[in-house]
Design a protein with these regions (language model features):
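Structural motif
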Residues: 30, 59-61, 68, 84, ...
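Ligand-binding loop in jelly-roll beta-barrel domains
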Residues: 81-106
């Protein structure tokens, strides 16, 4: 058994310049917890594999392709491979989301 204390994981350097902590990384999948401060957002980007998001705290705005929705705690959002997407925190609260990429990407994310 492996137990991960997310608060002790290092913040990964990403082009989004946000708090992103890798919590799971195998040949089959990778998972990252992203924390967005109030009014913070990810840059629109394309991921080479399918992604699903599970909202851990508060409410955020997700954009996938031409769709936009407000999503709150305990909601899961599917995002197909190669479709532009991003998260936006328009609130005054800290937003936290679990990002799971399956299968584990072999090429990088592309910013738009």
């Amino acid at each position: 058994m492996k137990i991960v204390d997310i608060s002790r994981e290092p913040i990964s350097k990403t082009p989004h310049n946000v708090d992103a902590r890798k919590v799971y990384d195998t040949e089959h999948a990778t998972a990252v917890v992203i924390t967005l401060a109030p009014k913070e957002a990810l840059k629109k980007h394309i991921t080479p594999v399918d992604v699903f998001f599970y909202v851990l705290e508060e409410t955020g705005i997700v954009e996938i392709g031409d769709e936009r929705a407000e999503v709150g705690k305990d909601h899961l959002v599917e995002s197909p491979a190669k479709i532009p997407h991003r998260w936006i925190n328009e609130s005054d609260q800290t937003f936290k989301v679990l990002v799971v990429k399956v299968p584990r990407p072999t090429t990088g994310t592309r910013l738009l």
